[in-house]
């Protein structure tokens, strides 16, 4: 029974943490269709991704401290319910401006799933057991980038981009029911913040904590590289290389497997190696891969070199995401909601600001996308190493 309960908790938290991938990856094969249907530009279509990412980021700033004060369960129910409702409303949208606003609101609701899945995990685990649980959680999270674009490509084949939001709404309703009937409160009243104001104050203290921020900002920029890839890959493979939505979805799914492998390997390595060392290697690996890929594309290579480079980059991101999250949450166990909120804010805000740059720097070449990924990886590396040396 205990094993079954743990499996259910793991799967539920993994799905809740995947609101970002669910909201982006299922939607990616539909971007060209959406652009044509709403008579808009590539950059405005990509802005709908940015809006959702910013909603995910800003929402976490409020949900995290509120959950430290009032517990995890009710903020989670309200947020996921709001996500489901907004998804259904988006189905009737006819203008890109309305879609962008609603995507922001959808992100606000989905932020509860992202921030509270990490907080609930920290309520239940600590130390290396948290690292192992996070590796499992991130592996489940990573399954969605595999399934979602394939499913999205299939939906586009039979319906249109609105059908994807109908499905997202249904998923939201199912998760509300799962939380309502299967998830108990994990933060006892004795461990909650004295007031909401005190919870926000604690989050402010985290911003000034270099030991925490080196993980939050370092991870944020590395994940920024992933969001640049998410925003640009649909147009690169479908419009530059003229692949079908289904073939693009297949390539994207293969990279999703690479993300799962990167996350999963951490759970095995952490038994013999320190998490700090694993994180350092993961960041350096990402910088090296994107640097070499940028150079090769500038010199002129084919689609297969790009595919291999992206596969390796995403593997490194899986390593960084898992270890940085575990290290940051371990360091701030008594402020789990605020710590999780800042991690989410960093990832989604940086990703949200980076994604429109892909369209602005040109949609007729893959080079801007890869150079932006390399830049994000380098900044993440510099922030992590800079903070580490300062704190030594």
Report residues per predicted region:
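Helix-to-loop junctions at the C-terminal end of transmembrane segments
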Residues: 60-71, 262-276
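Paired small-residue
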Residues: 82-89, 97-105, 304-312
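Juxtamembrane intracellular "pre-TM" segments in multi-pass secondary transporters
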Residues: 2, 186-216
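Conserved MFS/SLC helix-loop-helix module at the cytosolic interface between two early adjacent transmembrane helices
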Residues: 58-97
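C-terminal transmembrane helical hairpin of 12-TM major facilitator-type secondary transporters
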Residues: 277-323
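Helix-loop-helix hairpin linking two adjacent transmembrane segments in secondary transporters
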Residues: 98, 135-181, 250
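Cytoplasmic helix-loop-helix junction between adjacent transmembrane helices
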Residues: 102-143
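Helix-breaking motifs and short loop linkers at transmembrane-helix boundaries and internal kinks
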Residues: 37-39, 71, 92-98, 109, ...
């Amino acid at each position: 029974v205990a094993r079954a309960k743990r499996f259910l908790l793991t799967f539920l938290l993994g799905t809740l943490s995947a609101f970002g991938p669910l909201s982006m990856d299922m939607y990616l094969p539909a971007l060209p269709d959406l652009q044509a249907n709403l008579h808009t530009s590539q950059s405005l279509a990509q802005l709908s991704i940015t809006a959702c990412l910013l909603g995910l980021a800003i929402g976490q700033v409020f949900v995290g401290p509120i959950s430290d004060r009032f517990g995890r369960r009710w903020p989670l129910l309200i947020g996921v319910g709001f996500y489901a409702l907004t998804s259904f409303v988006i189905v009737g949208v006819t203008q890109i401006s309305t879609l962008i606003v609603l995507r922001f609101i959808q992100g606000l609701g989905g932020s509860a799933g992202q921030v509270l899945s990490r907080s609930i995990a920290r309520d239940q685990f600590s130390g290396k057991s948290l690292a192992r649980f996070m590796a499992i959680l991130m592996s489940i999270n990573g399954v969605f980038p595999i399934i979602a674009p394939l499913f999205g490509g299939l939906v586009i084949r039979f319906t249109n981009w609105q059908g994807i939001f109908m499905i997202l709404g249904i998923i939201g309703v199912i998760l509300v029911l799962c939380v309502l009937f299967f998830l108990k409160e994990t933060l006892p009243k004795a461990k909650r913040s004295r007031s909401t104001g005190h919870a926000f104050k604690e989050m402010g203290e985290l911003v000034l904590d270099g030991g925490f921020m080196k993980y939050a900002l370092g991870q944020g920029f590395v994940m920024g590289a992933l969001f640049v890839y998410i925003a640009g890959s649909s147009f690169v493979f479908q419009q530059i290389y003229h692949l079908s939505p289904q073939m693009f979805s297949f390539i994207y799914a293969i990279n999703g497997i690479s993300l799962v492998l990167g996350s999963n390997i951490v759970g095995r390595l952490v038994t013999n190696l320190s998490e700090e060392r694993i994180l350092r290697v993961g960041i350096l690996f990402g910088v090296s891969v994107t640097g070499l890929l940028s150079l090769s594309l500038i010199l002129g290579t084919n689609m297969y070199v790009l595919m291999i480079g992206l596969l390796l980059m995403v593997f490194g991101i899986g390593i960084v995401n898992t270890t940085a999250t575990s290290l940051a949450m371990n360091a701030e166990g008594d402020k789990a909601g605020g710590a999780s909120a800042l991690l989410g804010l960093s990832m989604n805000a940086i990703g949200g600001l980076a994604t429109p740059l892909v369209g602005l720097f040109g949609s007729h070449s893959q080079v801007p996308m890869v150079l932006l990924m390399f830049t994000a990886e380098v900044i993440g590396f510099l922030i992590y190493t800079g903070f580490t040396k300062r704190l030594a």
